UniProtKB/Swiss-Prot annotation:
Its EC number is 2.7.11.1. The gene is PERK3. SMART domains: S_TKc. It catalyses: L-seryl-[protein] + ATP = O-phospho-L-seryl-[protein] + ADP + H(+); L-threonyl-[protein] + ATP = O-phospho-L-threonyl-[protein] + ADP + H(+). Residues 1-123 are extracellular. This is Proline-rich receptor-like protein kinase PERK3. It is an enzyme of class 2 (transferase).
């Protein structure tokens, strides 16, 4: 095809390029074919945004099929549009007379060949990634927080335990160590056959009593937990409540409520303490007997305390008694049999059959409570450490005086001289009768604790404490002195009185003390 030698003026807006008639005919025919093909075929998917059609710069000229040329900037009139390229089938573009390549405007036959705008896809992807990432981060934080819970005192053994119940909880060894100032002597409240008791203050400010059992106990973890699970269900106003426990390696710790006004031993035998008046002594006797009776009569299975003593009877500010330290009590699985166990307890409170053979029943607790009643009556300790009286124990010293007091209603030799005879004689007679019945030598002749409670409260007669005697037929608690306890006396007066004590016992058919 011959090129035109005419030059295009630079200042003209549109320059018409003359071409041969044949080229015009072919171009017109091709354009009609493209138009008919576009009309017959379905329209392409609308994946473009038509707005930027005239705002974008025109592409480089590669298919100069338009009959007119326009200098940049490109015209905005749609009449200057040309059909798209048809590949190699397009005719070669005409050359300008000056040898320069002609400029071809943008072609828009109803669709764009440029890539689709990614605006909508990018928004959806960002939203999806944000939600997924947020869920992943939250899940990761949850597991990290659960895994990295604070641990108390890594140097201490790791605690093991099960939740006791709704009102109880487990404690770590570190928590109890901090609560008791590392079990310091300043926090030591007392020491018994089972271990040491410390005062502690928990993180919430509550005061507790922490009992640290002696290491080396043969009691296994399952046995300990089973026993603790039972006593955790016991709730009585005259029993110290169990708060929780801790098992850490070989360590066994019990956590009890803290009773602020010390123990009966402190108030009764403490050095420099004022004399406890009689009404308070009776109140303590009644309330403590109720707590012990609950263990024996209302628990199923019944619970044997094994270490009833003045030091385990706590006093609140109203002088109500709470029986403590039953956390190591022996559970009697059969009410008709005894439990053979290693002797545990405090000398001076042990029942004869328990100390001799280890045979344990609830009547062993009854004997120990009788010793506590003798302490309240006499003001003496259960064992004479200073050898003030010749007998080895308070019970041995009190046996003959108990009979005299019951027969003659003479309590001067038995009652605490610090009371200065300031006591109710009827109340004293009831307490003496209970003490005498509780410390009987034969276990089966001792009364039940519910009987002791009713006698102390004045609801039944002291004669109902007698075994084998119809209630109401006797006005005296039948007793017989153990000859061994009497004949060790250095004074002949005791031996001379033995005959009268023996005749009294035979008259009422009683049993030995």
């Amino acid at each position: 095809m011959a090129r035109s030698n005419r030059c295009v003026p630079q200042n003209s807006s549109i320059v018409q390029i003359p071409i041969e008639e044949v080229f015009k005919t072919q171009l017109k025919s091709r354009w009609q074919q493209i138009t008919m093909s576009s009309a017959s075929s379905p329209p392409p998917p609308q994946v473009f945004v038509p707005e930027p059609l005239f705002s974008e710069p025109p592409p480089p000229p590669k298919a100069p099929v338009n009959v007119s040329l326009s200098p940049p900037p490109p015209p905005r009139s749609p009449s200057t549009s040309t059909p798209p390229r048809l590949g190699n089938r397009n005719p070669p573009p005409p050359a300008s007379p000056s040898g320069q390549e002609p400029t071809t405007p943008t072609m828009t036959p109803g669709f764009s060949l440029s890539p689709p705008s990614p605006s909508r896809l990018s928004t959806g992807a960002v939203v999806g990634i944000s939600i997924g990432g947020g869920v992943f981060v939250l899940t990761l934080i949850f597991f990290l927080c659960k895994k990295k819970r604070p641990r108390d005192d890594k140097a201490l053994p790791a605690p093991i335990g099960l939740v006791l119940g709704i009102h109880q909880s487990t404690f770590t060894y570190g928590e109890l160590a901090r609560a008791t100032n590392k079990f310091s002597e300043a926090n030591l409240l007392g020491e018994g056959g089972f271990g040491f008791v410390y005062k502690g203050i928990l993180n919430n400010g509550n005061e507790v009593a922490v009992k640290q059992l002696k290491v080396g106990s043969a009691q296994g973890e399952k046995e300990f937990q089973a026993e603790v699970n039972i006593i955790s269900q016991i709730h009585h106003r005259n029993l110290v409540s169990l708060v929780g426990y801790c098992i850490a390696g070989a360590q066994r710790l019990l956590v009890y409520e803290f009773v602020p006004n010390n123990t009966l031993e402190f108030h009764l035998h403490g050095k420099g303490r004022p004399t406890m008046e009689w009404s308070l002594r009776l109140k303590i006797a009644v309330s403590s007997s109720k707590g012990l009776s609950y263990l024996h009569e209302n628990c199923n299975p019944k619970i044997i305390h094994r270490d009833i003593k003045a030091a385990n009877i706590l006093i609140d500010f109203k002088f109500e008694a709470k029986v403590a330290d039953f956390g190591l009590a022996k559970i009697a699985l059969d009410t008709n049999t005894h439990v053979s166990t290693r002797v545990m307890g405090t000398f001076g409170y042990l029942a004869p059959e328990y100390a001799a053979s280890g045979k344990l029943t609830e009547k062993s607790d009854v004997y120990s409570f009788g010793v506590v009643l003798l302490e309240l009556i006499t003001g003496r300790r259960p064992v004479d450490a200073n050898n003030v009286y010749a007998d080895d124990s308070l019970v041995d010293w009190a046996r003959p005086l108990l009979v005299q007091a019951l027969e003659e209603s003479n309590f001067e030799g038995l009652a605490d001289i610090k009371l200065n005879n300031e006591y109710d004689r009827e109340e004293m007679a009831r307490m003496v009768a209970c003490a005498a019945a509780c410390v009987r030598y034969t276990a089966r002749r001792r009364p039940r604790m519910d009987q002791v409670v009713r006698v102390l409260e004045g609801n039944i007669s002291p004669s109902d404490l007698n075994q084998g005697i119809t209630p109401g037929h006797s006005n005296t608690v039948s007793v017989r002195l153990d000859a061994r306890a009497v004949r060790v006396k250095p004074h002949g007066e005791m031996d001379s009185r033995w005959g009268r004590f023996k005749r009294t016992a035979q008259r009422y058919g009683g049993d030995s003390l």
